[in-house]
Curated annotation (Swiss-Prot):
<dbReference type="GO" id="GO:0005484">
    <property type="term" value="F:SNAP receptor activity"/>
</dbReference>
<dbReference type="GO" id="GO:0010008">
    <property type="term" value="C:endosome membrane"/>
</dbReference>
<dbReference type="InterPro" id="IPR000727">
    <property type="entry name" value="T_SNARE_dom"/>
</dbReference>
<dbReference type="GO" id="GO:0006906">
    <property type="term" value="P:vesicle fusion"/>
</dbReference>
<dbReference type="GO" id="GO:0005783">
    <property type="term" value="C:endoplasmic reticulum"/>
</dbReference>
<dbReference type="GO" id="GO:0048278">
    <property type="term" value="P:vesicle docking"/>
</dbReference>
<dbReference type="GO" id="GO:0005794">
    <property type="term" value="C:Golgi apparatus"/>
</dbReference>
<keyword id="KW-0812">Transmembrane</keyword>
<dbReference type="Pfam" id="PF05739">
    <property type="entry name" value="SNARE"/>
</dbReference>
<dbReference type="GO" id="GO:0000139">
    <property type="term" value="C:Golgi membrane"/>
</dbReference>
<keyword id="KW-1133">Transmembrane helix</keyword>
<keyword id="KW-0653">Protein transport</keyword>
<keyword id="KW-0333">Golgi apparatus</keyword>
<dbReference type="GO" id="GO:0012505">
    <property type="term" value="C:endomembrane system"/>
</dbReference>
<dbReference type="GO" id="GO:0006886">
    <property type="term" value="P:intracellular protein transport"/>
</dbReference>
<protein>
    <recommendedName>
        <fullName>t-SNARE affecting a late Golgi compartment protein 1</fullName>
    </recommendedName>
</protein>
<dbReference type="InterPro" id="IPR010989">
    <property type="entry name" value="SNARE"/>
</dbReference>
Length: 225
């Protein structure tokens, strides 16, 4: 059996370098106000996450077969530290992007399942504690982001409620204005109708009076003649 660690490590290192470049470009664009798509960066992160799984499996194989590969405790410790640092850096990049890590963030430090955890050195325990603290901090950042999002949604909902209330008041005012205008129009139409009728009656009376005067004048002329 060949030691698979260094081949997978080389792939992980190259992929991490690519992720760093894409991440720096993404952050520079976002800081300048340009919302550029990050599809390529997301793909690179997903690919690196899969490679990290293979790398952790390679570490486990190495620890279970350390004598076969001729590995001492210092080499195994170095491999575990490399994986932990790479894992932490990747999770930090994802959190700064505002996205959830590609793989669920565990609250337990990275360890290998070979029954040898009881024999870890103090330095290994320190690395594990540091990794666990990093994970707790990442979870706090994620929770803060969730709380901020919920607060923003509540604020927007309250603002929308106020705007809807104002619009309802405006509609009520408009309805009242329309009703008042209609009432004034009805009164005006009634007055105009009454005036028209009165004017018509007055003109008829004048015509009758004129006709009577003309008839009287004709009668007088007939009698005189």
């Amino acid at each position: 059996m060949e030691d698979p660690f260094y081949e997978v490590k080389a792939d992980a290192s190259n992929q991490m370098e690519q992720v760093r470049k894409l991440y720096n470009s993404f952050m520079a664009a976002r800081n300048s106000g340009v919302l550029s798509p990050n599809t390529e960066l997301t793909y690179a992160i997903d690919e690196l996450s899969e490679t990290l799984k293979d790398l952790k499996a390679a570490v486990e194989i190495a620890m279970k077969n350390s004598e076969h590969f001729g590995l001492d405790e210092e080499e195994l410790k170095s491999r575990r530290r490399f994986v932990s640092e790479l894992d932490i850096e990747l999770n930090n990049i994802q959190l700064k992007m505002g996205a959830a890590p590609s793989t669920p963030v565990s609250t337990e430090p990275y360890t290998v399942d070979n029954g040898a955890s009881a024999g870890l050195s103090e330095e290994d325990h320190a690395v594990n504690r540091q990794y666990q603290e990093q994970l707790y901090q990442q979870q706090d950042v994620m929770l803060d982001g969730v709380y901020d999002t919920i607060g923003n949604i509540r604020g927007q909902a309250a603002l929308m409620g106020e705007e809807l209330g104002q619009q309802a008041d405006l509609l009520d005012t408009l309805d009242n204005s329309i009703e008042t205008t209609n009432s004034k129009l009805r009164r005006g139409m009634k007055r105009l109708k009454d005036f028209t009728i009165a004017s018509a009656d007055s003109k008829s009376g004048c015509c009758i009076t004129v006709l009577i005067i003309i008839l009287i004048a004709l009668l007088v002329l007939v009698i005189v003649l």
